[in-house]
Amino acid sequence: MTLEEKIGQMSQIDARRIGAATALEVRGFLISDSQGIDRHNLIPMSRIDDAVSRKSLVLLK
């Protein structure tokens, strides 16, 4: 299962946990915690929450 498929199967609660303790690289974007690893590639959690509310993560490179 790819990372994209796994994210697609997450519930809202699971998806909101992304970046809480770890960072995931998804198609060149970094989802990180408040420490940040590469701030130029961070996806704001508000954008993640918005995507989760639509039950869809669309990550553009």
From Swiss-Prot:
Organism field: Solanum torvum
Lineage top rank: taxon: Eukaryota
Family (UniProt): Belongs to the glycosyl hydrolase 3 family.
UniProt-recorded Gene Ontology molecular function terms: hydrolase activity, acting on glycosyl bonds
Protein modification: Glycosylated.
Residue numbers annotated as active site: D33 (proton donor/acceptor)
Quaternary assembly: Monomer.
Signal peptide: none
Binding of D-glucose, residues: D33
Regulation of catalytic or functional activity: Inhibited by Hg(2+) and D-glucono-1,5-lactone.
Stated role: Beta-glucosidase highly specific for the cleavage of C-26-bound glucose moiety of furostanol glycosides torvosides A and H. Hydrolyzes only p-nitrophenyl-beta-glucoside, but not p-nitrophenyl-beta-D-fucoside, p-nitrophenyl-beta-L-fucoside, p-nitrophenyl-beta-D-xyloside, p-nitrophenyl-beta-D-galactoside, p-nitrophenyl-beta-D-NAc-glucosamine, p-nitrophenyl-beta-D-mannoside or any of the p-nitrophenyl-alpha-glycosides tested.
Protein's name according to its UniProt entry: Furostanol glycoside 26-O-beta-glucosidase
Keywords: Glycoprotein, Glycosidase, Hydrolase
Catalytic activity: protodioscin + H2O = 26-deglucoprotodioscin + D-glucose
Taxonomic lineage: Eukaryota, Viridiplantae, Streptophyta, Embryophyta, Tracheophyta
Activity-pH behavior: Optimum pH is 5.0.
Keyword Glycoprotein: yes
Tissue expression profile of the protein: Expressed in petioles and leaves, but not in fruits.
Enzyme Commission no: 3.2.1.186
